[in-house]
């Protein structure tokens, strides 16, 4: 069953490894604690995997700091991506893929090529939010991506500007069984991980 010993051990291991990456991406123990809490809140609100959200934060934090963004900005972008994926109806696998591609784009400082295509295919709502936030037509984004014009300093504020709208849209949607299950898994992983650290 779901609570078999092997599963418990793998959840505890996943919690440890995700949080180790989160610690490395944080500038202090206070920032780590607050980021961990906000990421869990985002995960539970959107029914997305804590591991995926923490990975997006951990992978993009360093590069976003180089552009002068704070941990709070990284958390807002993470929430915009997660919420956009849920509104888009992305599967867990698709969401994981988009999160990986998007964090790679942020690490490089530009969203283009394969990374843009991945977000465009599975994250329709993210792309529409990006277009709205940048004040351009959605159809123009592909050409901008090809020209290397979707730089982090444009993409990040554009997505953050749409967060309120994304939150409202998501709040109006009925909850799915899969997001309920993900919420239980997130909470259980935190509990197992916490018990394991005690």
Regions found by a protein language model. Give the residues of each.
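Small-residue helix-packing and pore-constriction motifs in hydrophobic alpha-helices
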Residues: 1-46, 55-66, 76-87, 97-146, ...
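Structural motif
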Residues: 50, 89-96
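ATP-dependent adenylate-handling ligase core
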Residues: 69
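Hydrophobic, low-dielectric interface segments
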Residues: 162-198
């Amino acid at each position: 069953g779901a609570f078999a010993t092997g599963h418990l051990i793998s959840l505890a291991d996943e919690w440890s490894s995700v949080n180790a990456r989160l610690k490395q991406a944080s500038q202090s123990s206070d920032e780590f604690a607050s980021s961990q809490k906000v990421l869990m809140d985002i995960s539970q609100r959107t029914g997305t995997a804590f591991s995926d959200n923490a990975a997006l934060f951990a992978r993009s934090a360093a590069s976003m700091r180089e552009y002068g963004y704070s941990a709070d900005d990284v958390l807002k972008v993470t929430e915009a991506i997660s919420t956009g994926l849920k509104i888009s109806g992305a599967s867990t696998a698709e969401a994981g893929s988009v999160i990986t591609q998007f964090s790679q784009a942020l690490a490089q400082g530009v969203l283009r090529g394969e990374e843009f295509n991945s977000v465009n295919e599975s994250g329709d709502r993210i792309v529409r939010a990006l277009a709205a936030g940048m004040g351009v037509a959605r159809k123009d984004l592909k050409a901008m991506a090809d020209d290397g014009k979707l730089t982090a300093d444009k993409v990040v504020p554009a997505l953050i500007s749409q967060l309120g709208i994304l939150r409202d849209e998501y709040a109006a949607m009925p909850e799915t069984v899969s997001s309920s299950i993900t919420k239980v898994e997130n909470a259980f992983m935190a509990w197992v991980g916490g018990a394991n650290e005690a």
